[in-house]
């Protein structure tokens, strides 16, 4: 039995969409093991005591509906959970699946010669803040010479859809193409999660990241503000990010091609796995990595 628990406070102002993002985020931990079926979902919910009665009812209903609808899209359903009161809203869940050991991809078997695949672009946190600043003139004036409100809205619309996009296709294809290890990229950024994954490998390996796919325009914003989010250092937090997968290069190219065919979204080879001395496992992002500016699109099926 594999069980994962995750919850957080909203980072978008549409409760229905936030419910979808929360569901996708909870399921990503299962998906990172190559498990693409969730047998049971419990919802964890906090209703805000700092809101008016009307706003609390509206936002809580939206969170529940978004979470439930995305569970249906993922082929599962909410069968219980826990609701509490809290100063700010919280949404998340507990996802459980029962699988055979041979149907799981344990995150420990990367080998020298593997490549690293990333299935979603980086920059969601920058997008969220960028969009919020539209309503905060004192902050917007810091970037008004290099950005427009329309750019902020376009990037944010893409980022929210990316966050809500299920990593389910990636999970299924990991098994099909015999991936060696995987993690999902969330709050610790690509640098933190890749380092944790590298240190968890049975063989002495270094993960070397040479490419960072970033939502178009977010690098410009971060650099203009003195690398406040440290986006090109891989330290910017992500919400419901992509899968970081270690696997043979030929298989990686097949997986990327099929993700693009099925999900209508890009994926990238962003690094490679190298041998190292025992006890020195780590991940490094090369100085001046190649930056891919990922153009926003709305090719989503939800």
Model-derived segments and spans:
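Helix-biased detector of long, well-ordered alpha-helical tracts
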Residues: 1-302
């Amino acid at each position: 039995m594999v069980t994962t628990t995750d919850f957080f406070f909203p980072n978008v102002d549409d409760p229905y969409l936030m419910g979808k993002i929360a569901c996708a985020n909870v399921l990503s931990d299962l998906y990172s093991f190559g498990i693409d079926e969730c047998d049971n979902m419990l919802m964890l919910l906090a209703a805000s005591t700092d809101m008016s009665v009307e706003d609390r009812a509206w936002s809580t209903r939206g969170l529940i509906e978004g979470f439930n609808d995305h569970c249906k899209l993922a082929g599962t359903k909410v069968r219980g959970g826990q609701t509490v009161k809290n100063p700010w809203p919280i949404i998340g869940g507990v996802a459980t699946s029962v699988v055979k050991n041979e149907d799981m991809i344990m995150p420990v078997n990367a080998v020298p010669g593997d490549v690293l695949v990333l299935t979603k672009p980086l920059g969601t946190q920058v997008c969220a803040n960028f969009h919020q600043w539209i309503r905060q003139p004192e902050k917007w004036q810091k970037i008004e010479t290099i950005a427009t409100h329309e750019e902020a809205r376009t990037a944010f619309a893409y980022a929210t859809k990316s966050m809500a996009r299920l990593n389910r296709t990636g999970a299924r294809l990991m098994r099909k193409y015999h991936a060696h290890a995987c993690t999902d990229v969330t709050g610790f950024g690509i640098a933190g999660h890749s380092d944790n994954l590298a240190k968890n490998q049975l063989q002495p390996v270094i993960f070397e990241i040479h490419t960072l796919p970033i939502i178009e325009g977010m690098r410009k914003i971060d650099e203009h503000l003195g690398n406040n989010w440290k986006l090109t250092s891989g330290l910017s937090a992500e919400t419901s990010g992509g899968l970081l997968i270690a696997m043979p290069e030929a298989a990686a190219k097949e997986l990327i091609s099929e993700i693009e065919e099925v999900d209508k979204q890009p994926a990238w080879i962003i690094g490679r796995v190298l041998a190292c001395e025992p006890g020195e496992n780590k991940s490094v992002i090369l100085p001046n990595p190649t930056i891919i500016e990922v153009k926003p699109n709305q090719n989503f099926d939800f």
